[in-house]
Amino acid sequence: MEATRQYIDFYNEVRDVLASRSCPEMNACREAALQTFSRQGFPSPKVERYRYAKVEADFSPNYGIALAPLGGQLPPHCFRLAEAEPRVRVLYNNVADATDSIVCLNTMLSVDTLVVHVPRGVKVEHPIQISNILKGEQDTMVCRRILVVMDELSEADIIITDRAASQNRFLTNQVVEVVMGDGSHLSLYDIEETHLLCTRYSSVFVRQGRDSSLHHTSLTLFNGHTRNRLDVLLQGEGSEVTANGCVIADKMQHVDNNTLIDHAVPGCQSSELYKYVLDDNAVGAFAGRVLVRQGAQRTLSNETNANLLATRSARMYTQPMLEIYADDVRCSHGSTVGQMDETALFYMRQRGIDEQEARLLLKAAFITEVIESIPLESLRDRLHVLVDKRLRGELSKCEGCKLCG
């Protein structure tokens, strides 16, 4: 509870500063978040969705906390929450899980919210790129908030990237809320390429309307400790979601992906594919729950978690789950954990490929399926290059700076 008290005391010290720098919609949610956070504290591994995370240990170091509002020129269709339309502003904190302590801490301490609003019928021609660059002279915690509002029949690609430009310790607590109107289409990409001293808790909450489609891809290329949460509520008939993920981890890295796909109405489809390549002493975790509610007939759902362990010391925890309360459904789920195919290695070495290169090629081939599923061709091509560099160890040679490439 010491870490919990540390953040409560800090909030009480800076609440006036937060109020002066934020808009009314954000300030109105802080006290309720404080009450929930004070009552619950940081979740322990006994909390099912945090079973594989050491939350209190991650949040215990004495970080300085950034309290600066958004600055600089924003991309097209992007606004500060205070500058967004009133009907958009009221959606703040309307989709996120207000009972989750990590979300509540974000609600307490976030100074600003980046809004991406695509109006009705607009098809955004170029991807909207949101770059989060961690830089500072001291160990720093950053609370980030993003609200994406896709009006009816709108289309967009959004790329969120996390990079580190200095070698300090960083702790990121990010909450992304997505509201998708009827017939809207969104491809949302989350790419993490930081360093071993970075800890990230990212929570993405999506609410989909009728006939909407979401393609979400999470890629962890380099990190220290990452915990990604994805909750998707399919509340409009005919809505679809594809949620894919790719993890490359080595050294002492830890990556935990936790997903919930909630089929609340009939006639919806979901597909999940998460692949991990773990080397050295890396630890991976995947817990994916698909919930088919009563009355959600004609549901189609497929969930797969496949994992490649390149060493005997790497560890993977996998827990795909199906919870079905309807009878007219087609649902499947499964997971695999395996080591390098020695037969394939032998075959490649017989043809003149050295062992190191052969292992690299097998790792790349294993995760190609996730990269190739990305609809955005320019990003797909770029990620093939980044994955190759990552597997060759070229990204980790300058862990303090990820801006080149």
Predicted regions and their residues:
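Conserved beta-strand/loop scaffold segments within soluble protein domains that form the structured core
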Residues: 87-353, 363, 367, 371-405
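N-terminal amphipathic, basic helical "cap/leader" segment at the start of enzyme domains
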Residues: 1-107, 119, 273
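Residue-level "edge-of-site" marker
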Residues: 50, 361-362
